[in-house]
Amino acid sequence: MSNNNNEQLRTALGAQVGQYENERAWQQQCYAENEAKISRLQEAKQAIQQSKENVEACADVWKTISLNFEADQDWEGAHKNDILNCMSTAVETDYNTYISNIDAVLDAICDEITRLENENWKTMGIIGHLSALINSLWNENSKLFN
């Protein structure tokens, strides 16, 4: 009987080991998939940040043109006032709205990167959970400076 119990125990333990190995392989696959997604998101984030810098540069140029046009003393009248109003309100407002929308996209990308990183951290036990909390706080801080 002892051999039969030992054999059953070995079979049960072998099944558990197989189950743990499958779980580990699945977690490693999820981890690798998340890392690939994070890499693509970081590339997109860099491209969008570069676009934002370009738009901000265009907005600065537009503001300079608007100020120079406003300072021009050779042209006066209602048409000049209409054009100045359009330049200073409509166009500048549109630039600011566009930049704010880019910021919202960057924040969303940062949130998704953090979510994926935290998923990976949480596979590492209690230290991973603590690291995920710190990572979330760091993300909120980083978004303030977008």
Task: Give short role names for the model-derived ranges.
Residues N34-Q46, D82, T89, T93, ...:
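Long amphipathic alpha-helical coiled-coil segments
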Residues I38-D72, E76:
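Extended alpha-helical coiled-coil "stalk/arm" regions
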Residues M1, Q73, L84-S88, S142-N146:
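Long amphipathic all-alpha helical oligomerization modules
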Residues E119-N146:
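Preference for long, well-ordered alpha-helical segments
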